[in-house]
């Protein structure tokens, strides 16, 4: 029994230090893929349709790793496009300043996600099944708590660090970097009626969301790359899903 307890404390999976780093990067990348493919391109913009298998997987995974509710995220993002760079934009660095969006982007998101008028006007067409009503929306915070338990069981004490990185990943890169730097630094392929910028021509770390100006120019396109030298890894994943009959 003592040996079993020690094994549990040390974690089910034992790896060298670099193995934990790689595992953390993979786990956080799955989260980013879920945000860009499921929440952003599928739910908010209807740029593609997802088969129930990846759709339910991403919903479950994002519940575990972010606690974000599909209706809330979709509504806030749609309002951002509808009111971009105005006083009604939930997270514009033009209005709030780049420092505030970079450092407090997740707080700006949570504030708008609690706005019933925003949810009513922009949250249409999002999941409203039993799972959404009774688990994902009703108990959004319990998902991240469950993820902590899973990480500790799998990886031992270092699982707490892995979990902490998972929890910070979306607020830093999605809520902060994309919503902030994506409207402040970078280059523009299109003179859109907003301050959107392409942060980098290679969209890998943030799933292709780095190509933010391209997205604002063609918001309903599932592909965010435009020039021959630009790369959108999210589009690559979508094409793979299409080949497997899991996306259209």
Task: Please identify what each model-predicted range represents.
Residues 1-177, 181, 221-248:
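Non-catalytic, topology-defining segments of multipass membrane proteins
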